């Protein structure tokens, strides 16, 4: 299961459109990394390091009794305006199937060569049909 971040021609991977479309899923991945860190002390992966300290500082502003709920408040459901600043190009690239249609087709081919036989997209509900149709028309048609 993966979130799709399909760039339009000339569009940055962290454009407002892509952040709005993928941000909740991207942040859910960051939430998992933070929860793991809080439980085990595990260091973040390289792609999360640019926002790591700032995110932990932001989370520490909340009372300990509600910190866990705050960490997962927007989990896969909406893009919290307070968290949007933590959605970076690095996080999008690391946690989503991202790129222009031709890049996505090559990534799918590489995954297939590695043994993947199915892919399940996890689009935002308000654009689910458009995302799936765009993937079919612009990526799957190239395979």
Q: Across the structure, where does each feature detected by a protein language model lie?
A:
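Structural motif
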Residues: 114-115
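C-terminal helical cap(s) of enzyme catalytic domains, especially alpha/beta-barrels
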Residues: 128-143
